[in-house]
Structures are given as structure tokens and as C-alpha cells.
Amino acid sequence: MAEGIAEAVRRLLADPARAVEILGAVQNDGVLRRLEAARSLGKLVLDTQAVAHPAYPDATIRTPLIVGLTTQDRATYLNEWFGPIAFVIATESTAESLGIARDAVRGHGALTLSVYSTSDDVIARAIDVAEDAGVALSINLTGGVFVNQSAAFSD
């Protein structure tokens, strides 16, 4: 599955002119340091690449980094890795994946949780997890995500 995600990202960003408009610029050197540090945290599924913006030659633009982890890598995936960094966590089952999501939200908080599935059963179980953990759930979301939409109503 991780390789399938990586291939989809590669295809989406294959045209540099399109990629720079999708990705946007890196805002600070901390993101670049995290990208470098994250490369060695697990299996490198998709390495980050620099992309030059034709209209903004001084812009720093990077493609996403995808790192494969195991459930034993909790100290890594339960931390925030701000930037174009994604972790794919190998689990034994959907139930285990949903349990990790529930425990992460309960233990660390979250504004949103996303699930992508074609299975009505998986979606129903994800709804139960989100309700139990007290987090907003998006199902098969495409387009923009409003990460902080809940913040104004947090009380």
C-alpha cells in the first residue's frame, strides 16, 4: 500500500510546473531540518526532492517525504512532524489501525481525523472511533481541509 501511495504522489507531482503550484514554498529552515531527520526514521518509501519555481527562483520547495514505520515506532509517529512529511504505519488489521488512531487522539489530542475507505463497515467503525475519541472526522475527503475549523468552538 505504501508504494501505491508513493506512486500516486510521483504521478501527481511529475510535471514541475504543476508541482510548484500544488506544493507551495517551505516557510522556514526548521522544516528542512525535519525533512532531513525524518529520512532515517524508517523505510524510505518516497524521498523528498527540491523543485524549482520558474516565477520565484528563490523559493524553497520540496516534494513530500514518505517514511514507512511499524507500530513499534510510537515515539516517532505520535510526535508532530510539521512539513511535507508522511508516515505510513504497517499494522496487522484495520482494527489495529483504528485503535492506534483512537489512542493517539485520546493521548495527544487532534482537531481532525481522516479515513479513506470504500468499505461501509470500515467507515462505520471509523465514525465510532472518532465519536469515542471526541474528534471531527472527514471521510474520503478530497480538496482542501480546514485544519483549524474546530479551534474557534473548542469550548
What does each of the following model-derived ranges do?
Residues 3-40, 48-60, 78-80:
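Flexible, acidic loop-helix segments that line cofactor/substrate-binding pockets
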Residues 61-155:
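Conserved C-terminal structural/oligomerization subdomain of aldehyde/semialdehyde dehydrogenase
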Residues 41-42, 134:
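Glycine-centered loop/turn motif at secondary-structure junctions
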Residues 14-25, 44-49, 110-118, 137-142:
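Flexible, glycine/charged-enriched surface loops at secondary-structure junctions
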